[in-house]
């Protein structure tokens, strides 16, 4: 009873704090004045509080359930929210003396995942249950934690790529809207990318263009670093899952929906790294691949659970 009450308190504190953090972040975004520096510092401290609250929540659930809290969708969503908070903490410690724009990605991601986890859709999963026989293995912590941390990093990196595309093609989207022409081929994207590079070189001395150039380069660099980290986690998760599958089901790979989409996710981001090796395709083109990967991750992590079929059906749920 005590642990359940403590978990309930920590859940609501973390959700409330991260909600305040998002509000403060948007205030600092739209009120570009020196007076909001204190507000920004408060938002950073708020994310630290959120991180420790979610950590306490997971530890509490681990203690009273007797197993690592990654046995169902509710627990994995809380762990995913913790992963977003962890990424924010790492970036905060690295750029303690500078403004951390990554919070624009990590804070909304944390509140979205935790908000869904604590919603009425997953009420039946809020109470810890006895671990399913298929999950009673030492591989649970290794496999599932690596997969969820991989999802968290890949989602953050993909969202940074989406932001890069929005900044790069803001004028192009405006032109398309005015002409009511929504056909946007890859060739046009390549042409506009080359055109933007020419304009950048021509107006390099312009402070506005130079700031945009710096911002896009920073987004591209951070996206690559975070996606690289997520890809490593995803690879470790898939390999450890294959070993676990061989022990549990007698086969390293069974091509059930979860495994198939995990392989598709891995392939998409492998293509992303391939585009990074080609100087003609890096930047905007690699960001397009990463943006596509954002949707693929959600299908793999969340969409497959809606089917409720396959060897990973214990993580499914129904929208009742």
From Swiss-Prot:
GO function terms (MF aspect): heme binding
Family according to the record: Belongs to the CcmF/CycK/Ccl1/NrfE/CcsA family.
Database matches in InterPro entries: Cyt_c_assembly, Cyt_c_biogenesis_CcsA, Cyt_c_biogenesis_CcsA/CcmC
PANTHER family noted in UniProt: CYTOCHROME B_B6 PROTEIN-RELATED (PTHR30071:SF1), HEME EXPORTER PROTEIN C (PTHR30071)
Transmembrane segments: 13-33, 46-66, 73-93, 102-122, 147-167, 226-246, 259-274, 289-309
Major site of localization recorded for this protein: plastid
Assembly, per entry: May interact with Ccs1.
Function field: Required during biogenesis of c-type cytochromes (cytochrome c6 and cytochrome f) at the step of heme attachment.
Localisation per UniProt entry: Plastid, Chloroplast thylakoid membrane
Gene Ontology biological process terms, A to Z: cytochrome complex assembly
Gene name linked to the record: ccsA
Membrane topology: Multi-pass membrane protein
Designated name of the protein: Cytochrome c biogenesis protein CcsA
Record key words, sorted: Chloroplast, Cytochrome c-type biogenesis, Membrane, Plastid, Thylakoid, Transmembrane, Transmembrane helix
Keyword Cytoplasm: no
Coiled-coil parts of chain: none
Example of a GO cellular component annotation carried by this entry: chloroplast thylakoid membrane
Entry keyword Transmembrane: yes
């Amino acid at each position: 009873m005590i642990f359940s009450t403590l978990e309930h308190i920590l859940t609501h504190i973390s959700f409330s704090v991260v909600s305040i953090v998002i509000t403060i972040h948007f205030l600092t975004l739209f009120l570009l004045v020196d007076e909001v520096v204190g507000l920004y510092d408060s938002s950073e401290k708020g994310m630290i509080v959120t991180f420790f609250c979610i950590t306490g929540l997971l530890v509490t659930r681990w203690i009273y359930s007797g197993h690592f809290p990654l046995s169902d969708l509710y627990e994995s969503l809380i762990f995913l929210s913790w992963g977003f908070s962890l990424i924010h903490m790492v970036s905060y410690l690295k750029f303690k003396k500078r403004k951390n724009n990554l919070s624009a990605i990590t804070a909304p991601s944390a509140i979205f995942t935790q908000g869904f986890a604590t919603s009425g859709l997953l009420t039946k999963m809020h109470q810890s249950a006895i671990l399913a026989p298929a999950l009673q293995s030492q591989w649970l912590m290794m496999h599932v934690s690596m997969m969820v941390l991989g999802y968290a990093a890949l989602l953050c990196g993909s969202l940074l790529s989406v932001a890069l595309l929005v900044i790069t093609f803001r004028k192009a989207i405006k032109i398309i809207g005015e002409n009511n022409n929504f056909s946007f081929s890859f060739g046009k994207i390549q042409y506009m990318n080359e055109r933007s590079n020419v304009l950048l070189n021509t107006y390099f001395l312009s402070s506005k263009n130079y700031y945009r150039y710096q911002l896009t380069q920073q987004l591209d660099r951070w996206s690559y670093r975070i996606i690289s980290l997520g890809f490593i986690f995803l690879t470790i998760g898939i390999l450890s899952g294959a070993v676990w599958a061989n022990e549990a089901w007698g086969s390293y790979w069974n091509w059930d929906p979860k495994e198939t989409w995990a392989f598709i996710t891995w392939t998409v981001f492998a293509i992303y790294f391939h585009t990074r090796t080609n100087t003609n395709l890096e930047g905007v083109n690699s960001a397009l691949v990463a943006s596509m990967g954002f949707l693929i991750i959600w299908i793999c992590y969340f969409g497959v659970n809606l089917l409720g079929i396959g060897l990973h059906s214990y993580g499914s749920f129904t929208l009742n």
